[in-house]
C-alpha cells in the first residue's frame, strides 16, 4: 500500500519519519524545525554534538545549507561526480545551518540520494531531510519496513513503505576539502 501522502503530511507536521535509502532505512525530519530534530535525537538517544546528515533529491536543495565559497571548483567537481548516489560529503556549513543539524562542527554532512522514493519525498517536501540510520542505540540499522516497525514502530508516526536499494551498509562519508574517507561505504 502506498502511504506516501500520509508520510509527507507527518513530515510537514514536524514529525520524525522512517524511509528506505540506498543501503539501510533512515529516520529523519525537517532540518529547519528544532522541535522535530529534538524528537529525532530523543528517539535515537543521539547527542546533538554529533550532527546529522542532510539527504536531498538534488544539489540545488542543499545549496542553502552549504558554503560553496570555501570549496574549489576541483573539490566541487569531485563531489558532483559521485552524486546522485550513496556518498555523503562533509562540506562547509552556511550561516543558515543551526547547530541542531551541524552539531559541534562548522561543517555539514550532505548527500544527493539516488533512491527514487527519497527523491520523491524531498521533492514533494521542497527541501532536504535529516538522515540517520533507523535503529535504537546499540542495535544494527534496520533493513526492512518490518524491522523498523519492530524496533521503532511505537516511537514513529509514519514509515514510508518501500525497499532499500540493496546496498548492505550505510553510505560512505568523505571530507570535501581533502577527499579523505571518514567512514567506509
Swiss-Prot record:
Subcellular locations according to the entry: Cytoplasm
E.C. no: 2.7.7.87
Record-linked Gene3D superfamilies: DHBP synthase
BP-aspect Gene Ontology terms: regulation of translational fidelity; tRNA threonylcarbamoyladenosine modification
Region (Disordered), start-end ranges: 163-185
Span of the signal peptide: none
Gene (name only): tsaC
Pfam families, per the entry: Sua5_yciO_yrdC
TM stretches of this protein: none
Domain YrdC-like per the UniProt entry, residue ranges: 1-185
GO MF terms, alphabetically ordered: ATP binding; double-stranded RNA binding; L-threonylcarbamoyladenylate synthase; tRNA binding
KW Transferase (keyword) present: yes
GO CC, alphabetical: cytoplasm
Function: Required for the formation of a threonylcarbamoyl group on adenosine at position 37 (t(6)A37) in tRNAs that read codons beginning with adenine. Catalyzes the conversion of L-threonine, HCO(3)(-)/CO(2) and ATP to give threonylcarbamoyl-AMP (TC-AMP) as the acyladenylate intermediate, with the release of diphosphate.
Domain of life: Bacteria
Catalytic reaction list: L-threonine + hydrogencarbonate + ATP = L-threonylcarbamoyladenylate + diphosphate + H2O
NCBIfam families registered for this protein in UniProt: L-threonylcarbamoyladenylate synthase (TIGR00057)
Family, as annotated: Belongs to the SUA5 family. TsaC subfamily.
Protein name: Threonylcarbamoyl-AMP synthase
Chief localization: cytoplasm
Biased amino acid composition, Basic and acidic residues: 164-177
Alphabetic keyword roster: ATP-binding, Cytoplasm, Nucleotide-binding, Nucleotidyltransferase, Transferase, tRNA processing
Amino acid at each position: 500500500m502506498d502511504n506516501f501522502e500520509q508520510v509527507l503530511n507527518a513530515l510537514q507536521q514536524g514529525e520524525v519519519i522512517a524511509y528506505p535509502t540506498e543501503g539501510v532505512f533512515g529516520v529523519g525530519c525537517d532540518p529547519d524545525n528544532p522541535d522535530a530534530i529534538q524528537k529525532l535525537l530523543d528517539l535515537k538517544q543521539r547527542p546533538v554534538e554529533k550532527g546529522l546528515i542532510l539527504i536531498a533529491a538534488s544539489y540545488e536543495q542543499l545549496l542553502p545549507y552549504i558554503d560553496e565559497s570555501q570549496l574549489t571548483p576541483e573539490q566541487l567537481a569531485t563531489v558532483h561526480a559521485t552524486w546522485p548516489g550513496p556518498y555523503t560529503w562533509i562540506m562547509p556549513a552556511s550561516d543558515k545551518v543551526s547547530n541542531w543539524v551541524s552539531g559541534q562542527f562548522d561543517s555539514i554532512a550532505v548527500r544527493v540520494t539516488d533512491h527514487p522514493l527519497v527523491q520523491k519525498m524531498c521533492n514533494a517536501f521542497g527541501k532536504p531531510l535529516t538522515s540517520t540510520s533507523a535503529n535504537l542505540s546499540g542495535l544494527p540499522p534496520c533493513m526492512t519496513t518490518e524491522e523498523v516497525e519492530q524496533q521503532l514502530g511505537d516511537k514513529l508516526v509514519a514509515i514510508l513503505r518501500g525497499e532499500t536499494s540493496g546496498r548492505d551498509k550505510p553510505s560512505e562519508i568523505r571530507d570535501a576539502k581533502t577527499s579523505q574517507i571518514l567512514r567506509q561505504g
